[in-house]
Amino acid sequence: MKFSIIALALAVAFVCVAESRSEEEGYDVSEEIQAEELEEAERGGIDRKLMEVVNNLRKVQGREDSEEAGRGGINRKLMEMVNNLRKVQGREDSEEAGRGGINRKLMEMVNNLRKVQGREDSEEAGRGGINRKLMEMVNNLRKVQGREDSEEAGRGGINRKLMEMVNNLRKVQGREDTEEARGLKDKFKSMGEKLKQYIQTWKAKFG
């Protein structure tokens, strides 16, 4: 209680001294107070602006340490890429995995050709596959050429396709001109002749 009374008395004395001093020196204490308030207001405006900038940085960067955040994001992206490569290639050594995958794919293609052409029942499979291919070619020729010039186009297209098939068989079987290949080629030629006769008969009937 005594302390509060003493503090109040000191405050009253300070105000009285300040007023008497302002009267003697010719300036108003209120002006000094206004200047201090203006300075505080300016500082408050600057503080608000700084807080806005800080908040914007936090929103954009997602945290206060933007450099670390950037590095962390890049590292995460790199790890995702590495993991994706590992998943696709099935192992860390991508070069070996690539070569192994290509070799497996080539072996699958060779095995599929063997099964179709096939060293299991190559004659029947060959005849069935060739007949289907020839019928598809005939149907395509009819649709594309409109039945106007089927004989010449049929001979040229069929001969090219037959030669491609013969060449593919030669490459897969590892020889260029064996008795089997010659016999198969003769079969292809005879089938081509039959197809030619069929086309001529069809043209004679339907024009």
From Swiss-Prot:
Processing quadruplet motif 3, short sequence motif: residues: 96-99
UniProt short sequence motif Processing quadruplet motif 5, positions renumbered to this chain: 152-155
Post-translational modification Phenylalanine amide, affected residues: 206
Top-level taxonomic group: Eukaryota
Annotated Gene Ontology cellular component terms: extracellular region
Propiece span(s): 23-43, 63-71, 91-99, 119-127, 147-155, 175-182
Subcellular location: Secreted
Motif (Processing quadruplet motif 6): 179-182
Motif placement: Processing quadruplet motif 4: 124-127
Placement of sequence motif Inverted processing quadruplet motif 3: 119-122
Inverted processing quadruplet motif 1 (motif): residue ranges: 63-66
Motif position, Inverted processing quadruplet motif 4: 147-150
Family of the protein in this entry: Belongs to the cationic peptide 03 (latarcin) family. 04 subfamily.
Record note on domains: M-zodatoxin-Lt4a: Probably forms an alpha-helix which disrupts target cell membranes.
Name assigned to this protein: M-zodatoxin-Lt4a
